[in-house]
Amino acid sequence: MYAIIKTGGKQYRVTEGQMLKVEKLAQDVGQSVKFDDVLMVAAGDELHIGTPSVKDAAVTAEVVDQGRQAKIEIIKFKRRKHHMKRQGHRQDFTAVKVTEIALGKAKKEVKTDGA
């Protein structure tokens, strides 16, 4: 079973037990976080695709770590002018471990003509 979730402006394919680095979340280490914006769930040969998200589906994860990525350097310069600007950036992240992919009651609506 796997799911595609959306968090922090990005989409991730997750399975149960998977470790994942996502954009910084407000929860502390050891707390549980629930991702409700599930775009797709595949369970065996069943495929549930949301429009835009699957109703009653949720992915639960446990926060394992809060940290910062490796530094990237941004360098801007103007040729032949002896002018250079250096800048660095470290992005914050939250490492989570997916504990459960829950697919709620997926009810199919049947339209009937009132004739």
UniProtKB/Swiss-Prot annotation:
**SUPFAM superfamilies with a match to the protein in the record:** L21p-like (SSF141091)
Q: Which GO terms describe its biological process?
A: translation
Q: Tell whether Transmembrane is among the UniProt keywords.
A: no
Q: Does the keyword Electron transport belong to this entry?
A: no
**Leader peptide range in chain numbering:** none
GO CC annotation, single? cytoplasm
Name the keywords, alphabetized: Ribonucleoprotein, Ribosomal protein, RNA-binding, rRNA-binding
* Coiled coil ranges: none
One example GO MF annotation: structural constituent of ribosome
Q: Which InterPro entries match?
A: bL21-like (IPR028909), bL21-like_sf (IPR036164), Ribosomal_bL21 (IPR001787), Ribosomal_bL21_CS (IPR018258)
Q: Which PROSITE patterns match?
A: RIBOSOMAL_L21
Concerning its family, UniProt says: Belongs to the bacterial ribosomal protein bL21 family.
The family database entries (PANTHER family) matched by this protein are listed as: 50S RIBOSOMAL PROTEIN L21, LARGE RIBOSOMAL SUBUNIT PROTEIN BL21M
What is known about its subunit structure?
Part of the 50S ribosomal subunit. Contacts protein L20.
Role of this protein: This protein binds to 23S rRNA in the presence of protein L20.
Full protein name:
Large ribosomal subunit protein bL21
**Protein's organism:** Coxiella burnetii (strain Dugway 5J108-111)
Q: From the UniProt record, report the name of the gene that encodes this protein.
A: rplU
